[in-house]
């Protein structure tokens, strides 16, 4: 259970503009929670809700 999330690990949760859930899928915005990608990564910007800055992002792989 993620302390920042209202659901069990791997489950679903709702999120606002910023996401604190690490292992959850957001249901309200239909996007995964992940780290922000560097500028220029349109794929991550469109498919993720940022929870923090990072040089590497699973959505950009």
UniProtKB/Swiss-Prot annotation:
Sites where the protein binds a divalent metal cation 5: 34, 36-37, 50
Binding site for a divalent metal cation 6: 37, 41, 44, 60
A Pfam family that the UniProt record links to this protein: Metallothio
UniProt note on tissues of expression: Expressed in reticulocytes.
Residues annotated to bind a divalent metal cation 2: 7, 13, 15, 26
UniProt cross-references to PROSITE patterns, sorted A to Z: METALLOTHIONEIN_VRT
Region (Alpha): 30-61
Key word Zinc present: yes
Zinc among keywords: yes
Keywords of the record: Cadmium, Copper, Metal-binding, Metal-thiolate cluster, Zinc
Family indicated by similarity: Belongs to the metallothionein superfamily. Type 1 family.
Free-text note regarding domains: Class I metallothioneins contain 2 metal-binding domains: four divalent ions are chelated within cluster A of the alpha domain and are coordinated via cysteinyl thiolate bridges to 11 cysteine ligands. Cluster B, the corresponding region within the beta domain, can ligate three divalent ions to 9 cysteines.
Name of protein: Metallothionein-1L
Organism of this sequence: Homo sapiens
Name of the gene: MT1L
